[in-house]
Amino acid sequence: MQLYNTLSAKERANLIDQAGEVRLTLSFYKYAQIENPKLFRDYLFIHWDKINVLGRIYVATEGINAQLSVPATRFEEFKAILDNISFLENVRLNIAVEQDNKSFLKLKIKARDKIVADGLEDSEFDVTQCGVHVDAQSFNDLISKPETLLVDM
């Protein structure tokens, strides 16, 4: 089974033009404990390559960080693949406002040490322990307090 791209960027661009279909550009990330990033990488490649997903995805023991495009007609199928992965079920997908069918020309999924170059040592904390979601009013109330420090990443 092929787990890598065989077409050049130019060949892929021509195929995108010939297909004439609208693609959705989107991104998502999720901190989760992935025991075998290389195996997970291969799983994603096998499933996403079948539905013509293109993009740049990083997988590590700490989670996944993805920027990609998917044919609009295959979006529900793509979403179903995500929802079959327990920690990605109902993950928030950030769909780009401006679309470019050629935002990505290849599917590149890389197993890495980290999904974000943040300089932190993951062994010092549990990346799956996240904060509490607050609505807009609560957020505004929190940041209006002088003792609140807001870090925008």
Which residue ranges define each predicted feature?
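Cytosolic catalytic domains that perform sulfur/thiol-centered chemistry
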Residues: 1-153
